[in-house]
Amino acid sequence: KALQDVSFSSQAAVNLRLKDKSKAKWVMNLLAGGGISTHPDKGLWSGELFAMQMKKEWQNITLYKTNNTGKNLETEVNDFIAGKDPVKLEDYINVGNVSVPYLEKGRTLFNRSHLFSTGWLWGLKNEWEIRSQINYLNDRSTAEAETSTTYYRSVQDRIIHEEKQSVTHTDQLTAHFSVEANKEAFYLKNNLKTSLSWNDINISMQEDASGIMQQASQPQYKVSNDLQLIKRPGKWLFSFTALNEGQWRPQSLRVEWGNTIRQRTKDRYFYTHEEANLGIQWGRLNISLAGGGSALFRDFDSSLEGLPDSLGTMINALTTNYQSLQLTPKLEYKRKRWEGKLEAPLQYYHYSFAHAATNKHVYLFSPSAYFRWHTTPKLYLFLRAGLSTDPCDLHSLYNGLVMTDYRTLSRGLNEYAAVKSRFLSGGFNYKNPVKGLFTHVMVMRSWDDSDKQYGRDFSDKYIIGYYTHHPTTSNNWTIMGTVTSNLDFLHGMAGINVMYINSEQSMISENDRTSFRTGSLHTTGRINGRIGEILNWQYRVSYGWNRLDADEQVNRKLEQWCHSFAMTVVPVTRVNVQLAGEYYRNEVSENIFKDIVLLDAKCSYTLTPHTELSATLMNVFNRKKYSYTIYGQLSSVEHYRRIRGREFLLNLYVKL
């Protein structure tokens, strides 16, 4: 309410009103299902229980979900705690499976999942309310994969073939508690969040004739408090935000490969950020000034045992702190068909490194400008340009070796390094709601200048990735476009999306600096329609390629095709039939394609207004492998992933 007449939302408001007979009563939904599967060769289950009660003083929603059918419940937990990560730290140990492009995640997820969630809302006097949310997830998943990795080298390419089976156990407990006041004079909200997760991964591998075992323990503990205040004193608008966050990651990796190798890491930090914003509207001009400060206190320790000392230092013990001040003036102007915005953030960082003899003082200036011209009520052109300097990447700030998986070692920098960027983008947006035609096109060019250079060396059976303090440049082209239009004669619509990315960069490979280019194109066309009340249908076709070019070493380009369709038929009132199919054609190496066809079917029958019975048949043709190849930094990885086999599932849905 405090932003009324100042800020507009594109999200529609939804007001729900319960019938009198439904108030103060529990509303419950139950879903229970069972079936069989060819891979994994075991029984299937799927269950959901949803309970809700609405009272004048309080409201509650509680649910329990469980399945082993490939439905990912982890995303539902992450949605509750999702938010911007100000520190952007990552795990140093990384032994998990990579995501599969194009293919739905449930196809490759062999899981056994349980999720419990309960949320409460208490309404207080004077437009105050209290909310709480608690979630607990228990998940066990397995995966089977084969990979063939090629590292392109000036002398002779190195090829590594792996077969692995993994078992992952995850326990995650999240809690969210908030207090909110929404008044015309001010808005106040305080969020207290915590996330405790335990992730254990066991991997048995076969590389050529060698047997390898990996055991990774990756717990992560996080607590944060976020305060937001908005006030409207007259024509002025004042806001204040405060974020305090702490995180601890005590993680370990154990490798059995001829001998025992142990990697331990401890990464912990406390981060605080406070910011105030004062703005005023002066005719067509909006003027605002934001200022604040932040601080980070971080310790990183690691130790590596079981490798020869000749590879390098095996210990890290770093303390990295910084204090920062920020000031951001902003101007916004709107006159008839013209709009413009200017921002000029100025930041000061004081870094203190326990391992360095001197501290570091850094000033960062990141101005940007945005202009929009409405040539007609339906069409506008836009232009955006700016400069930016990113602060030090703390994740790469270490000097000793860290084992990320059984074969890969990494080494960072022991001194400050920054990345300076420039960008220029422009495009247009056209919308004609009457005819149902919408178009958006954007072209962006960017340049990056970095103080650090990534490199890769090979030592016996290990691959060492590292950073060195050396100036390097890269540049990128990005083109995005989308067009959608109503098709009245089909009672549907059609559209096309295009994404093109081209990047030029360099790296050090075995002491030689090598320039390379990567590119990708992804286009998707779609069309859907309806025939009376009987049939709904849709068809989608996607084409893409990814490319890797390196001077005198490699010039590769691989293509991918995907066709998919879905249709829903209602032959009689109580019967609903759904069919869905996918055809993938992936080029895994030059002129060698792998094809796979997947077909699913589902039939639902409404027994009563509160009861429905459904039968689902997944992967009708019982396909077992999905193959694809992706390019990296002077490397390519050919993947073969095991997918879920033919499955039959019966579900009963009851509304109590």
Residue ranges of each PLM-predicted region?
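Membrane-proximal, glycine/serine-rich, low-complexity loop/turn segments characteristic
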Residues: K1-N199, Q214-L243, N277-L289, R335-W338, ...
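Transmembrane beta-strand segments that form the barrel wall of outer-membrane beta-barrel proteins
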Residues: W26-P40, N60-Y64, A344-S352, G412-N414, ...
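Signature for the C-terminal beta-barrel architecture of outer-membrane proteins
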Residues: A417-F423, V443-V483, T514
